[in-house]
Regions:
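A polyampholytic, Gly/Pro-enriched intrinsically disordered region
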Residues: 56-57, 115-131
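Conserved donor sugar-nucleotide recognition element shared by glycan-biosynthetic enzymes
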Residues: 55-58, 62, 106, 135, ...
Length: 202
């Protein structure tokens, strides 16, 4: 079996790292080649502020790790926290830094959402734990608090897919990270139109 050279980028809540993996046909060896801090930043508006991921800096750190690996990488996998996302406009440009799941804008959104869609139905469709950091509640808050910006959005990409898009130009929605959103129909393994409509994105 031919040798394989792989990279894994792991973005945690406070730090990130890039790990190089080599498979020689018999065994795998792993080496951490780049580590970096991951600290949120605050974006200030006229009336509100939001805690965000410093996405462009994190993307630069990802590129540094790729460069350190050399030019013989066969594949790369990207792992991040769930639920958070970036908004793209019609031209595919990132509208703003992705908001951090620790931002307080979703406080009370579970109660507001329950007035639009019954929680028993929501759980039956998604099987997801009820947490106000879930993408479903984040999108409801986005639509309420940053209505103009939300109105310019053409597409939502979850964070691993957003990094992948910046690397490759390809837009995808990988299933396992999408399953953290509370937007998926667990039985059909596809987006739930009822929930998307309730979130105002369908």
């Amino acid at each position: 079996m031919a040798e394989k050279h792989m990279l894994a980028a792991d973005f945690g809540g406070s730090s990130g790292r890039v790990v190089k993996g080599n498979f020689d046909g018999n065994q795998i060896s792993l080496e951490e080649i780049h580590r970096f801090a991951n600290e949120p930043v605050t974006l200030w508006g006229k009336e509100t502020s939001v805690m965000c991921w410093d996405f462009l800096r994190l993307f630069c750190e990802l590129k540094k790790g790729i460069l350190k690996a050399g030019g013989n990488t066969d594949s790369i996998g990207i792992d991040t926290w769930g639920v958070d996302y970036g908004l793209l406009d019609q031209s595919g440009q990132l509208l703003t830094n992705p908001i951090h799941y620790r931002d307080l804008r979703t406080s009370g959104m579970r109660r507001e959402a329950a007035a639009q869609i019954e929680e028993s139905f929501l759980y039956e469709i998604t099987g997801s734990q009820f947490m106000e950091i879930n993408t479903f509640y984040q999108l409801l808050a986005e639509k309420k608090i940053r209505k103009d910006l939300f109105g310019m959005a053409e597409q939502v990409l979850f964070l691993p897919d957003l990094f992948g898009y910046f690397l490759s130009g390809e837009r995808t929605a990988e299933y396992s990270i999408a399953s953290t959103s509370q937007l998926l129909d667990a039985r059909g393994k596809s987006w739930s139109e009822e929930i998307l409509k309730a979130a105002g994105i369908s």
